[in-house]
Amino acid sequence: MVYAQADGIVNQDSSDVTMRLNGAAMGKVIDSGSCGKNVNYELYDDYTLRIFGKGTMYNYDWSWSSSDNELYPNVPWVSWISKIKSVVIEDGVTRIGSCAFMNCSSLTDVNIPNSVKSIGSDAFYACSSLKKINIPNSVTSIGANAFFECTSLVEVNIQDGIVTIAEGAFCNCSSLKQIDIPNSVTSIGESAFNGCSSLTEIIIPDAVTSIGDGAFANCDNLEYVKIGKGVTTIYDCVFLLYHTNPNVKTVIEFTAETPVTLASVVYFDQVYNNNAFADPENVIIRVPETMLDYYRNSEDWSRYKDSFSGYSSTDPTGISSVDNGQSATKADAVYDLQGRRVTEMLPDRIYIVNGKKVVNKFRD
């Protein structure tokens, strides 16, 4: 039996090769080959897929199977995709190819090194067992549908460096509870986080200048969204939310002290420009006090004119007075001074109740 280090390639019959990564045996090689001009792969009998070499992986496409109504990537390890449990991408690989790990339904662990600069479209499409992903600061772009329908994905760590999050990148990641969008991001594509129904808070940094249609649609448990100063246009259905609980409201906070416009959409010769936030009753839209009259009198925003409230630059909470002695029940829609939904109600604090009152006491 032949042992090899992780940075070496052993040209032996795959049935006789056992790989060691950081001193630990990974198992016997059961498949191997090329997946890039200077990039190779090895699959071990513990279903760890190792990608190694220098440069980019090939971009692959996919095929649809009518027999089981499934998509299958045209990758050399396609016969193993339902069994692959771990993917180890070694330093030197600069791009994760399109459809590379599509439908690897047993995949739970992925290592992305600092050499990777981009993640291709559909790269981890429907990896339904993947729970966590760390994206290093070397990555500047996440391709379309890269993590589409990774339904078990709870945690995504994206480091500063990423510039573009493409359309559908995290669409239907229904278990995703938190996403920290780095300050380096300038563009969020259409439906990028559509259907991320476990998200409760989104902070969009000032560097973002473009948010595509439906980017956060159907994130029906969103409670707080802060939109940075770089966003000047809100496109159709960006925050189209349908709350099943009528007591839940989403607080949308604009930070720009210049007008944010609603883009128009033409559909069957009909012009629409007021579907950004679904029903006005579901949202509280907080804007700088200097912009409040603009929004309330704007024809574009007329559907939401009663949803707006203002805050001053010296009072970031937007609250200039407190109605002492008011109270709220636990059934009320209660928010803290940052506009975030309160789930644990503490005594002798100041809160926003149903978007109208400010209180400092609770009663059961």
Residue ranges and their predicted role:
Residues 350-364:
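C-terminal tail/sorting-segment detector
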Residues 4-6, 23-27:
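Boundary at the C-terminal end of the N-terminal hydrophobic targeting segment
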Residues 34-95:
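LRR flanking "cap" motifs
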Residues 2-4, 16, 349-353:
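Short, aromatic- and glycine-rich surface loops/edge beta-strands on solvent-exposed regions
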Residues 97-102, 120-125, 143-148, 166-171, ...:
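Consensus positions within tandem repeat domains that build extended binding/scaffold surfaces
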Residues 20-22, 312-338:
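Residue-level detector of functionally pivotal "anchor" positions at catalytic/ligand-binding pockets or at interdomain
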Residues 2, 48-54, 81-95, 105-118, ...:
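Structural signature of tandem-repeat unit edges
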